[in-house]
Amino acid sequence: MRGIILALLLALAGCEKSQYEPFFSESKTYVYNYEGIILNGIPENGLARSGIKLNCKVELSGYAQRSYMLK
């Protein structure tokens, strides 16, 4: 009986609909700040590595139905 209940719960959890397409309101502007580091070199002790740090500000706003403008 426990096995049947467990199987039903797993089947119910597996059939849940996932929404992968993002939804953004056309009347709002969304602002995101990204930061990243890129490192180059050989990952051995005593060897030099170089890198660069990137900062980015992204503005996303609605342009038309299902169309968005990225700045």
Swiss-Prot record:
Residues 1-15 form the signal peptide. Precursor of the major egg-yolk proteins that are sources of nutrients during early development of oviparous organisms. Residues 24-71 form the Vitellogenin domain. Keywords: Phosphoprotein, Signal, Storage protein. GO terms for biological process: cellular response to estrogen stimulus; response to estradiol. It comes from the Eukaryota. Induction: By steroids (estrogen). The lineage of its organism: Eukaryota, Metazoa, Chordata, Craniata, Vertebrata. InterPro entries: Lipid_transp_b-sht_shell, Vitellinogen_b-sht_N, Vitellogenin/Apolipophorin, Vitellogenin_N. This is Vitellogenin-B2. Produced by the liver, secreted into the blood and then sequestered by receptor mediated endocytosis into growing oocytes, where it is generally cleaved, giving rise to the respective yolk components. GO terms for molecular function: lipid transporter activity; nutrient reservoir activity. Transmembrane segments: none annotated.
